[in-house]
Amino acid sequence: MTINLKNFLNDKTKMSKMGEFQNLKQIEGLEMSSVSADLYGNGRDDLSLFYFSKGANYATVTTTNTIISETLAWNNFSHKKSIKGLMVNTKNANTFTGKQGKESLDIIAKNLSRILTLKESKSERGTSETVRIKDLIFASTGVIGEEFPVDQIKDALPNLVEKLRKEHNKLFWLKVASGMMTTDTKPKVAYEEIIFGDELVKICGVAKGSGMIAPN
């Protein structure tokens, strides 16, 4: 695993001790990655991917505002109950981007589904199962009203998929969480586990948020 030190080398970041963060555990069936598409122009991680090769149940709570991002509109349109991939980009919220923002997601989804399908065909399982466009959802955070950086994100997708890994430790969870940050001063992670019936349920939380104006 390579840690991108540029995630932490900026004026707004306040380095925290590792002990301040909870130790998130490995989640079976989940692969994660975080890379730089150079959206900030400084090489820090700005794309994160959560991939469930066998699929995962999906639920969401979203804004009640009538003005939503093209990313949220994409997710709402298909009424998904299960997914295989969630890609998160920072720097650009894909809001007030109109047709360009919508078409950008179409391009990214087509390319990401193709690359993930190719990955599966080369896996030890040797599966030929297709990762479909409708198996993917997206999250975008950052500034509004700016053209969505589709070409930079598209060019970074092969590296994003190549860097997927199944083994997760605290440092890797923090790397992925750092790839979502905008003006946040540090990554945000949380962990809890409960016994449900006879089973141990692990709950890992990764979040971002800073300087939001009346979020709803």
Where do the language-model regions lie?
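N-terminal amphipathic/basic leader segments beginning at the initiator methionine
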Residues: 1-65
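Short, conserved beta-strand segments within well-ordered enzyme catalytic domains
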Residues: 48-51, 73, 86-89, 137
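Glycine-rich oxoanion-binding loops at beta->alpha junctions
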Residues: 57, 61-78, 182-196, 201
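Short active-site-adjacent helix-start/loop capping segments
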Residues: 57-59, 81, 94-97, 145-148
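Residues forming anionic-ligand binding surfaces in small-molecule and nucleic-acid pockets
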Residues: 82-89, 216
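Alpha-helical support elements that line or immediately flank enzyme active sites
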Residues: 90-118
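Glycine-rich, mobile lid/loop segments that gate access to catalytic sites or pores
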Residues: 111-117, 133-216
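Intrinsic disorder/low-complexity segments
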Residues: 118-132
